[in-house]
């Protein structure tokens, strides 16, 4: 049964194939070179007839005379003097022309005259028709001429109007060139002289300011008498106002200025880093990060004390000393450009000395910002996330490469690409010392090296959002009541 079905299918396929082959038409002869050319409606315009001129009118040949038929009798033509009446005496011959003779002569001449008159009437009618057409054409030409005359007159009026306007403009330009431009030149010359003097004054002021800024900036404000080893000791001694104080962690070193936060979470915080307005450049070398830079505090509404923190980095030597005095906790606070705030608190925070490249260690995280220092960027997974962990890293600046990016290319360095000094791995999940971007959001084409070099905390806002404010504060760890 299966073999029968296969044989049937083969027969059907053969018949269909033969039928398909029969459907092909025989090839047609090639187009005759002198034949028509079909119009391609997709590419060509359809052919159109040209308008024909009117036929020529007027007189021509006269009508042809009718030919005599064979059975018609041939009329004997006789001279006029042979057509008169006969005399009674045949010998006398033909009489002189009489009424009968004149009548016959007139009858003989009437037919050709009527034919000529009819032909003349036709010619007159043709001339009349032609004259009528000519008159109409002349009338049309006359109307067109009148319209052209009116148009020419209108154009002359427009030309006269524009000529008047152009003349007024020419007079105005002449007056402006002759009167106003010299005056304006004198005014501009005076303005340029004034600008030149202002520029010279600004250059002098800039030179003086640059000379003034060669040394660290100082703040003119009163410093409280109360002091201590750090801000926690100061608050225990009665210093309850958040402002700039003098601390002396060790009697072997001179006291130095710090800003103490006496309000946040029971106070006693020593501010070691603060970003708030981009007024200080954090893209610095190793030595400035070692010693510290920026403005510790500023006056608040012309008060005598410095109640507002400035933008600064306290200095790695000072931070290392403060954290190695005993157990230290770290509080990192940040604020976006909408005013929302989060924080990251680490119960343990230590920075080693310069010989150990200021190695950092943190633990005991809690907070709302995300554990960027210990866990790395939460958006990444696996090895990529591990590369962004900061805990255990050495401190790096663009002139001292200690990051975790192992490469022989000196251009590939985290501190160079990310805008500041920090405990970079390869490279960061947090970048508090990065470039300050107003407005928060920024993109790779806005950055210097096409990298996320802003004031970043990836676990909260990602790589391409720079914080409005970020501060780092430390305090000796002690049990809270």
UniProtKB/Swiss-Prot annotation:
<keyword id="KW-0175">Coiled coil</keyword>
<dbReference type="GO" id="GO:0031639">
    <property type="term" value="P:plasminogen activation"/>
</dbReference>
<feature type="disulfide bond">
    <location>
        <begin position="231"/>
        <end position="260"/>
    </location>
</feature>
<keyword id="KW-0732">Signal</keyword>
<dbReference type="GO" id="GO:0051592">
    <property type="term" value="P:response to calcium ion"/>
</dbReference>
<feature type="region of interest" description="Beta-chain polymerization, binding distal domain of another fibrin">
    <location>
        <begin position="35"/>
        <end position="37"/>
    </location>
</feature>
<dbReference type="InterPro" id="IPR037579">
    <property type="entry name" value="FIB_ANG-like"/>
</dbReference>
<dbReference type="GO" id="GO:0005198">
    <property type="term" value="F:structural molecule activity"/>
</dbReference>
<protein>
    <recommendedName>
        <fullName>Fibrinogen beta chain</fullName>
    </recommendedName>
</protein>
<dbReference type="GO" id="GO:0062023">
    <property type="term" value="C:collagen-containing extracellular matrix"/>
</dbReference>
<dbReference type="GO" id="GO:0090277">
    <property type="term" value="P:positive regulation of peptide hormone secretion"/>
</dbReference>
<dbReference type="GO" id="GO:0042730">
    <property type="term" value="P:fibrinolysis"/>
</dbReference>
<keyword id="KW-1015">Disulfide bond</keyword>
<dbReference type="GO" id="GO:0072562">
    <property type="term" value="C:blood microparticle"/>
</dbReference>
<dbReference type="InterPro" id="IPR012290">
    <property type="entry name" value="Fibrinogen_a/b/g_coil_dom"/>
</dbReference>
<dbReference type="GO" id="GO:0005577">
    <property type="term" value="C:fibrinogen complex"/>
</dbReference>
<keyword id="KW-0391">Immunity</keyword>
<keyword id="KW-0964">Secreted</keyword>
<dbReference type="Pfam" id="PF00147">
    <property type="entry name" value="Fibrinogen_C"/>
</dbReference>
<dbReference type="GO" id="GO:0045907">
    <property type="term" value="P:positive regulation of vasoconstriction"/>
</dbReference>
<dbReference type="GO" id="GO:0045202">
    <property type="term" value="C:synapse"/>
</dbReference>
<feature type="disulfide bond">
    <location>
        <begin position="221"/>
        <end position="306"/>
    </location>
</feature>
<dbReference type="GO" id="GO:0072378">
    <property type="term" value="P:blood coagulation, fibrin clot formation"/>
</dbReference>
<dbReference type="GO" id="GO:0005938">
    <property type="term" value="C:cell cortex"/>
</dbReference>
<feature type="glycosylation site" description="N-linked (GlcNAc...) asparagine">
    <location>
        <position position="384"/>
    </location>
</feature>
<dbReference type="GO" id="GO:0051087">
    <property type="term" value="F:protein-folding chaperone binding"/>
</dbReference>
<dbReference type="GO" id="GO:0034116">
    <property type="term" value="P:positive regulation of heterotypic cell-cell adhesion"/>
</dbReference>
<dbReference type="Pfam" id="PF08702">
    <property type="entry name" value="Fib_alpha"/>
</dbReference>
<keyword id="KW-0399">Innate immunity</keyword>
<dbReference type="GO" id="GO:0005783">
    <property type="term" value="C:endoplasmic reticulum"/>
</dbReference>
<dbReference type="GO" id="GO:0007160">
    <property type="term" value="P:cell-matrix adhesion"/>
</dbReference>
<feature type="disulfide bond">
    <location>
        <begin position="414"/>
        <end position="427"/>
    </location>
</feature>
<dbReference type="GO" id="GO:0071347">
    <property type="term" value="P:cellular response to interleukin-1"/>
</dbReference>
<comment type="function">
    <text>Cleaved by the protease thrombin to yield monomers which, together with fibrinogen alpha (FGA) and fibrinogen gamma (FGG), polymerize to form an insoluble fibrin matrix. Fibrin has a major function in hemostasis as one of the primary components of blood clots. In addition, functions during the early stages of wound repair to stabilize the lesion and guide cell migration during re-epithelialization. Was originally thought to be essential for platelet aggregation, based on in vitro studies using anticoagulated blood.</text>
</comment>
<dbReference type="GO" id="GO:0031091">
    <property type="term" value="C:platelet alpha granule"/>
</dbReference>
<dbReference type="GO" id="GO:1902042">
    <property type="term" value="P:negative regulation of extrinsic apoptotic signaling pathway via death domain receptors"/>
</dbReference>
<feature type="coiled-coil region">
    <location>
        <begin position="149"/>
        <end position="213"/>
    </location>
</feature>
<dbReference type="GO" id="GO:0045087">
    <property type="term" value="P:innate immune response"/>
</dbReference>
<keyword id="KW-0094">Blood coagulation</keyword>
<dbReference type="GO" id="GO:0043152">
    <property type="term" value="P:induction of bacterial agglutination"/>
</dbReference>
<dbReference type="InterPro" id="IPR036056">
    <property type="entry name" value="Fibrinogen-like_C"/>
</dbReference>
<keyword id="KW-1064">Adaptive immunity</keyword>
